[in-house]
Amino acid sequence: MPPRKRRRQCQKAQLLFHQQPLEGPKPHYESHQQPITHTVQVPSKPIDQSTITSWVLPQFDTAAESRFPTHRKHHRDQARHPTRRSTCKFPRLTFESPESSSSETLLLSNREQLQNSEKDAPRRPLVPLFSPQSCGELSVHVPQSLPHVFMPPDIQTPGSSVREDPISPDQKENSLPSCILGPRTPRTPEPGPVLVKDTPEEKYGIKVTWRRRRHLFAYLKERGKLDKSQFLVKT
């Protein structure tokens, strides 16, 4: 077997200096701090703790935070699990304007009514939107809710001076389409502004620079000062 290599000592010996440091021995783990020589005395004024926060509204008072101590560990868990719903620990702010408060109460009551109606209503089987079954249901329910005859948007209705004759429910059902929400033919978009005009046949093969200078081009061509190679495109 080959002889084992001797491990070298990693710790090197401390360097030795012939001269001692001028400022004395320096500590190994502490920075040298200079002594404080210049001190300034500032006149102090007593502070009244009761008047410091007199301008702060009670809803923004820091005492509310002391009632609900913060839990750092809980916040870390929330960051790890973002799907959990976060609950507000601080009291809601109250506003003085009555309009905003009334609108908020109306919104809350409407949401509760919608949730209750969704819970109470029996679940129906899902039906595609444009299936014949859904079209039949729409044609049954729509005539009862519509007071007048359904008119397509493309047909111009007469003015308000023309009186409408009373129509029987049988005629209403016949006049309505089988499915109101049926697919409509898309309207063709109107043509936009012309960005670049087409080149007329007279100017085919002529360079663009001479197309923009028609008077100069005709003048030089009549005088014979332009060769074909100067104004015609090479093919």
From Swiss-Prot:
Comp. bias regions, Basic residues: 69-87
Recorded GO CC terms: chromatin; chromosome; nucleus; site of double-strand break
Record InterPro entries: RHNO1
Low complexity composition bias: residue spans: 96-106
Main location group: nucleus
Residues with Phosphoserine modification: 50
Gene Ontology MF: a single term: chromatin-protein adaptor activity
Listed PANTHER family: RAD9, HUS1, RAD1-INTERACTING NUCLEAR ORPHAN PROTEIN 1
Function field: Involved in microhomology-mediated end-joining (MMEJ) DNA repair by promoting recruitment of polymerase theta (POLQ) to DNA damage sites during mitosis. MMEJ is an alternative non-homologous end-joining (NHEJ) machinery that takes place during mitosis to repair double-strand breaks in DNA that originate in S-phase. Accumulates in M-phase; following phosphorylation by PLK1, interacts with POLQ, enabling its recruitment to double-strand breaks for subsequent repair.
Name of the protein described by the UniProt record: RAD9, HUS1, RAD1-interacting nuclear orphan protein 1
Encoding gene, per UniProt annotation: Rhno1
